[in-house]
Amino acid sequence: AQVFDGEVSWGINMMSQQPEKSDQETTDNLKLENNDFPDSFMDYKSKGYSAELIGKETFDGTETFKIKLTKEPKTIDGKKEDDITFYFFDTENYVPIAIQTMITQGPSKGMTMEITMSDYQEVEGLYFPFSQTQGIKDQPSLPLIIDSIELNPIIDENEFKFPEN
């Protein structure tokens, strides 16, 4: 899990099972990602992003609009790298059914990460995908099934603080 309080990014080291602060580059990139909450397309122009309709494309048997979203560059290994994501919106009801982005670091660098979304359900007037998969394109992916969504719960800010002990 990755935790971010707005200033400090940290997670649990899988080997030691101890909390570890992230390096500055990771923290800076998480700050950029916070610009996208609750959605990358919300106010995209004022964030300096650009969106381009690539055209219609069939994705997993569904006709979609393929949109290229170019966001503020991320820093990877000390260099600014383009942050480009492709979204596939169902042409019938305009919900995203897939997201593809190039992996820019680590052992999977150069491969395409793919997230698929389905089983949209309404929660307090908003639609959310209750079924998702995430993985490398054209390889087995990890499923995520959501049982329920609670909007705007009260969460103690201390949950996000790095444990000092």
Q: What kind of feature is each model-predicted range?
A:
Residues 1-4, 85-87:
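Broad, structure-driven detector of short, well-ordered beta-strand segments within folded domains
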